[in-house]
């Protein structure tokens, strides 16, 4: 499952994101880099949950800033 999600993420980063204006993320690391790290660190299920929470925060009412992937416990 994780490999498929990483493949979809790669497709998004190289083909869809440039059409949307490229790097406009208000966070560091960018949301797509965060997603890749979350999937590699936590696997598919928890990684998807972390990605979902990050995307919800990525909106005009949030200042953004440094938001790393939490470490595994």
Curated annotation (Swiss-Prot):
Its main location: membrane. It is found in: Cell inner membrane. It is a peripheral membrane protein. One of its GO terms (cellular component) is plasma membrane. InterPro entries: Membr_insert_effic_factor_YidD. Pfam families: YidD. Keywords: Cell inner membrane, Cell membrane, Membrane. Could be involved in insertion of integral membrane proteins into the membrane. Belongs to the UPF0161 family. This is Putative membrane protein insertion efficiency factor.
């Amino acid at each position: 499952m994780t490999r498929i999600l990483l493949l979809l993420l790669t497709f998004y980063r190289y083909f869809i994101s440039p059409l949307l204006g490229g790097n406009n993320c208000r966070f560091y690391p960018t949301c797509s880099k965060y997603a890749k790290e979350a999937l590699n660190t936590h696997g598919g299920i928890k990684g998807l949950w972390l990605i979902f929470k990050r995307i919800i925060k990525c909106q005009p009412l949030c200042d953004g800033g440094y938001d790393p992937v939490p470490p595994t416990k």
